[in-house]
Amino acid sequence: MASYKKKLVKLSFTGALHIGAGKNDNYDHSEEIIHSDTIKSALYATYRQVYPELSQKDDGEPFFASFRVSSAFPYFGNELFFPKPLAGFIPTFSDIPAENKSEIAKKSKKIQYVGFDLFNNWVNGIQPNVQQNHLDSSGKFLFSQPHEKNVKVLTRNVQQRVYIPPQGSDAMNTQPYFIERLFFGKEAGLYFLLDCPDSEMLSRIQVCLHVLGDIGFG
């Protein structure tokens, strides 16, 4: 009988990262999460390279059906972040006077990610009561516990580049374009949840993850 295996996978990045939005990706904007289907596809492509004798026997359906993954969201140290709920998430700041509603609304609107404990409390009907030092320096990340004011989970940078046509084509038809890159803080990165009941398949997936750590997700 297969044992039940569930893992938390953390991805750390030593350099810049651009997360595309699909076939029609505009390079001047990077996503901040890696969607679950992208993670699964990257794992399958690596699985076919590492285990060709297994992957060539089928169309991939047994592989995709053997495990589940979440999308990859930001983390900082031990703090796991979830996207802020679209509705009903109403934090109060104990160090901002209640009558200063515009300031509270401004800070609340800017929040995009919520720490696990605060998110879990909200799911159970408890609205967050926090202070301004629960926010990172960008105001986008709301930590479950107070943090240093200058904490940066991630920053963005837009760089101009030039596309040069392949040799033999119209070499004069160069095209400038912009690419946005993400830089994660020293203790930050992306995480996702991996749910794989089969121990043998889990071991293979872990091997594929180590390979992806060297070659990237694409």
What are these regions (language model features)?
Residues 1-218:
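Conserved active-site/ligand-binding neighborhood in enzyme cores
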